[in-house]
Regions:
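Pyridoxal 5′-phosphate
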Residues: 1-148
Length: 148
């Protein structure tokens, strides 16, 4: 055993590294697919739901931050969760309160208070984006009618 006892090697980490290395040849293809999906999400959510895109145009295509002014993030989160759609509010740096990152980007409170963070992975499809857009449009109708 060359001086090592069994259990010394971090087998889960080794297997994770193996998987990452095996996936390297597909990285550029996956990145291009993510960019296309991210752009589709931007266009779809803006045109169908009136979403304001907070993410810069040159952001990495794995996270999209949007706002639906007039609707609080937490209210939208619960509405989406009830439909098995899971996103986050604000930014990863500000769980539970207004995001200083979004404020530093120059966003007004109306946008930071309604911000949603959408994360993408290689398994997401345009259909997933369409379902999200449908749910956000429904949320706007229901919440407007309920005066929330």
């Amino acid at each position: 055993e060359n001086g090592m006892r069994s259990g010394t090697e971090p087998v889960p980490l080794i297997m994770g590294l193996k998987g990452a290395v095996e996936d390297l040849p597909n990285l550029n293809t996956q990145l291009e697919k993510q960019k296309q999906l991210w752009n589709y999400a931007r266009e779809t959510l803006m045109s169908r739901c009136g979403a304001v895109i907070n993410s810069p145009d040159d952001a990495l295509p794995y996270i999209l931050n949007i706002s639906l002014p007039g609707y609080r993030s937490e209210t939208l989160l619960h509405f989406l969760e009830a439909r098995n759609i899971f996103v986050s509010s604000g930014s990863a740096c500000a769980k539970g309160h207004g995001s200083y990152v979004l404020k530093e980007m120059g966003l007004k409170p109306a946008l930071t208070d309604s911000a949603l963070r959408i994360s993408f992975c290689k398994n997401n499809t345009e259909n997933d984006i369409d379902l999200l857009a449908d749910a956000l449009c429904d949320a706007e109708k229901v919440l407007r009618k309920a005066n929330i």
